[in-house]
A protein has these predicted regions:
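Intrinsically disordered, low-complexity, charged terminal extensions of DNA damage-control enzymes
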Residues: 1-17, 23, 186-352
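Catalytic cores of DNA base-excision repair glycosylases
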Residues: 2, 6-7, 11-198, 206-209, ...
C-alpha cells in the first residue's frame, strides 16, 4: 500500500465520480449517504439521497420526525433497520452532542447502526481522522493486490486489512486520510469491480503492483465462504378492494419489516377457493395476479396473488385510497409488484 499511495491519490483526484454527497465534507450528508449505500447501488441511491435531504436537511429534523414519515421517505431502499437506526442515532446526537456528529472515532462507533466501516468513512472524510474505512470494495482490492487466498468474509482477515490501511494512513499528510480511503473504495467500485472481470487497464492505480493481475489470478481472488442457501417461503398476497380503497395492515413492531405496512397475505400458495375459505366474509375474486419474488439476506418470498372485491370494509384491516398508498403509508419493496398494481388499479364503487 505504501508504494501505491501517491499514484492512488493522484488517480482518485483525476477519476473520482461526481456524487451529490461529495459536494462538501459535511458529516451529516456523508453519514446518510454511507448508510444508504449499504446493500444499495450508487445510481439507485442518488434520488433517495436527494429526497431524504429535502425532507430531513439536518440531524435535528431527522431526530424530530415521526417514524412513519421516515419509513415513507425510505420506501424502496429496503433494509428498514437502517432507517430505524438513523433516527435512534440522530436522537442521541441531538441530546448528547448538540446536534452535530462527534469528531471522535469511538463516539461514532457507539451510535446505533454505525460499524467500523461507517465510522471510518465519516471520521476520515468529514474530520480528517486517520482511521480505516474497509468495506467489500476495499477488501476485494487489497486481496488482489496481495494475491491473497484468505477468506475476506472472516473477521480476522478484515481486521488484518484494517490494520494495514491504518499503518499507511499514519504516513499521509494531514487531511489526506479521507481521500485515501475514498480512493480505495473508488478503485473497488469502478476498476476492481464487484461483478465480472476487473478492468485492470482502466487504468488501475495498482496495475504495477497487483499480484493477482501479474499471476492471472483475478478470477480466483478474492476468496469468499459460500453463503448458506436461503429458505424459500411461499405467500399469497391479497389486493382487497372496496370502492376506491385497498386494504393494508401494519406489521408487528419486531421482526422482519417491523412496523411497516403490507397487503394482507396468507402463508402458502393458495387457490382462490382456499383464499375465500380463510377470509370468511362476503368476497369475490376478480382475477389472479402475477407472481413475484423478493430476496432477503436469509429468505426468499415467492408470491402469488389475487385481486379481491368486498362489499364492506373488513375489521382489522386499514382501507386506504391510492393517494394515501402513494404518500402516507410505507409499504416495503418486498411488495413492490403488488404496490404498483394497487396504484394502477381502476377502482369502482362499492357494491351494495
Amino acid at each position: 500500500l505504501d508504494a501505491a499511495r501517491g499514484p492512488l491519490l493522484s488517480w482518485y483526484r483525476e477519476n473520482r465520480r461526481d456524487l451529490p454527497w461529495r459536494e462538501n465534507r459535511d458529516a451529516y450528508r456523508i453519514w446518510i449517504s454511507e448508510i444508504m449505500l449499504q446493500q444499495t447501488r450508487v445510481e439507485a441511491v442518488k434520488p433517495y439521497f436527494a429526497r431524504f435531504m429535502e425532507h430531513f436537511p439536518t440531524v435535528q429534523a431527522l431526530a424530530d420526525c415521526e417514524e412513519e414519515e421516515l419509513f415513507k421517505c425510505w420506501e424502496g431502499l429496503g433494509y428498514y433497520s437502517r432507517a430505524r437506526n438513523l433516527k435512534k442515532a440522530a436522537e442521541i446526537i441531538v441530546s448528547e452532542y448538540g446536534g452535530a456528529l462527534p469528531a471522535d472515532h469511538a463516539a461514532l462507533l457507539s451510535l446505533p447502526g454505525i460499524g467500523s466501516y461507517t465510522a471510518g468513512a465519516i471520521g476520515s472524510i468529514a474530520f480528517g481522522l486517520p482511521v480505516p474505512a474497509v468495506d467489500g470494495n476495499v477488501m476485494r482490492v487489497l486481496s488482489r493486490v496481495a494475491g491473497s487466498y484468505e477468506d475476506i468474509l472472516k473477521q480476522a482477515v478484515k481486521k488484518k486489512m484494517e490494520l494495514a490501511v491504518e499503518e499507511t494512513l499514519k504516513t499521509l499528510k494531514e487531511g489526506e486520510a479521507g481521500d485515501f480511503n475514498q480512493a480505495l473504495i473508488e478503485t473497488g467500485a469502478i476498476v476492481c469491480v464487484p461483478n465480472g472481470a476487473p478492468l485492470c487497464g482502466a487504468p488501475c492505480p495498482f496495475y504495477t503492483v497487483c499480484e493477482a493481475r501479474k499471476k492471472d489470478l483475478t478470477a480466483e481472488i478474492p476468496v469468499k465462504t459460500p453463503k448458506k442457501k436461503r429458505k424459500i417461503e411461499e405467500k399469497t398476497v391479497l389486493l382487497v378492494e372496496c370502492g376506491d380503497k385497498i386494504a393494508i395492515r401494519k406489521r408487528d413492531d419486531t421482526g422482519l419489516l417491523a412496523s411497516l405496512y403490507e397487503f394482507p397475505n396468507l402463508e402458502g400458495k393458495l387457490s382462490g377457493k382456499e383464499v375465500l375459505e380463510q377470509m370468511k366474509c362476503r368476497a369475490v375474486i376478480e382475477k389472479e395476479l402475477p407472481t413475484a419474488k423478493h430476496i432477503f439476506s436469509h429468505v426468499e418470498w415467492h408470491m402469488s396473488g389475487y385481486l379481491i372485491r368486498v362489499t364492506e370494509e373488513i375489521p382489522g384491516l386499514l382501507f386506504a385510497d391510492r393517494e394515501e398508498l402513494k404518500e402516507k403509508y410505507p409499504i416495503p419493496n418486498a411488495f413492490a409488484a403488488y404496490r404498483k398494481l394497487a396504484a394502477a388499479q381502476t377502482m369502482d364503487s362499492c357494491e351494495s
